[in-house]
Amino acid sequence: MSQQQEQSPSLDDCLKLLKGERDEQRLAGLLLLTKFCRGDDHASIRRAYDAVGSQFLDRLLRTGMRKGPNGGSDNDNRDAYLQLSVTVLATLCRVPEIASSKEMVSKIPVVLEVMSKESVSPVLEECYEFLYLTSSTNEDGVTTLFESDGIRILASPISTFTDGSHLMELSMKLVQLMLSKVSLGIITDACLVEMSTIVAAIIRQFAMLHNALKFDALHLLSAIFSSDYSGPLKEELGRKTNNHWPDYLLIGVVAILQNRVAPAEKLHSLVLAETAISIMGERWLINPVKLPNMQEQVPPDRCLLLVLESSRVEVAVLLNDIAYLKYEASKNTSSTMESILSKRRHLGIAFSLVEKIIRLISTIGEEEGSLVDDNTFVKVINGLNETIAVVLEYLQDAKDHGQKKGDDLLASVRVVGSYLAETPMACKEKVRELLAYMLSVEGEDEPSSPFSSVCFLMPLLCQITMDFEGCKSLVSSGGHRAIVQCLVKLVGQNALTDSSGGIFLACDTVLNLLIKREELQLSMDASLYIDLLKALTYWADIFLLAYNSLGNKLCS
């Protein structure tokens, strides 16, 4: 109570000055306001704003910018006027009702202009504070911020800010606000280069910080890269690797995955890892980090092992959750369906990383002097074997429940096919047990008989049909019919793909079967092979390439 009594005269004096007729009185009142008004004293700030009025604040700001009638005549006081005006604006906007007012939103373009011309930290910080307070309380403020070249102005100084500074934090919050209101596609169409500069700066924060702002950066980056409109941004980042963003991203991902954090945070990090690989290639996982002033180097294989282990865990958890929701939870409720769709999206990230690691191991396994030693190689193979075993169990569960259609099932077949293409003998008994089922799996949008699942398994099928036992296993399951039907779709008049690689694999697989047809006692379905001959003829006419050996075998 005594403190309030001491402050009352100061507030009264301030209000009298703010209501004064002369500018000198009002200036003195504003100075007094910045001295004693606390940010949480909304009542006093509200009274001060009502006393001074928006018109005088506009005039003071424009004078500080040399835009008023006497703006250029008093250069000595210009900086002081500018500093005072933005400080007062930021102070007033601590009251949400003032910050969200049309008067304050209308000042956003002017404050952005100040930012584009000023490099003095105190002025900049007050400007950023004002922008955040106005934009976070009024959606029109966010729109005005973007339409007034906000992204370009934010991008200009962001790489010069100190790691973890208040300016950097406010910059990230402003970007997040704009993304919540404006589509990333619209933003990148308008200022792609500037947005890539901002993202690179945020990636550095994700790597270098060890506080809550690190996770803010993680969430913001994950949201950006998860957007359907992130393609152009990824391409632009691929053209500007000289600012070390791939190394910073690797450091941040490793820091999250190797520490005890919530599963959701690890999933966000996997999103970033998948993004980095899609831009830089699979070798990003094992590339040595080359950063100036790095005290502790990251071992070349650490990121690879952490990403694989985290992906393996995610696959196991997500498949278990999806199976529960599909087969045991309450059916056909909106919340159940939304949860399944969300988990499918997350599963797609984990599966994508597993496939990329498979490609990486396949490539480096044939190289000499690789950064991956034998011990790491064995760990990766063991991790992949465990992952594929879990996926096969999920497919077995789906088979037992009579489920053949679903994007999660098709994605499971794809990752199994990717691995078995490199190691056809892995999980041999389980694969042959499930082969017929996997060939029957369809995606949600496939209109008729299975196609994609057969294509995903074709590299495996081509390899196992090179020996009699593999052919026997395939024929006994009826898989040879699925292969022929797939080949018809690949080369027919309404071909579903233009991939010559898939066509040749399918042709070789059919040839392997036909060569051994007498031993297999393979019964010929005339109508099926007639359709294939017609399709091959059409394909040969189009590409001037007759696959004669296959045609001869069919007709012999």
Located regions from the model:
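Well-ordered alpha-helical segments within folded domains of soluble proteins
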Residues: S85-T87, C127-E129, L347-V354, S412, ...
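Leucine-rich repeat domain C-terminal region
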Residues: G252, R260-H268, L272-A276
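Elongated alpha-helical scaffolds that mediate protein-protein interactions in large eukaryotic proteins
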Residues: M1-S156, T160-V199, F206-H219, S226-D247, ...
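Alpha-helical repeat/alpha-solenoid scaffolds of the HEAT/ARM/MIF4G superfamily
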Residues: I279-H401
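Eukaryotic acidic, serine/threonine-rich low-complexity intrinsically disordered regions
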Residues: L410-V413, T423
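Blade-edge beta-strand/turn elements of extracellular beta-propeller
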Residues: A201, G252-V253
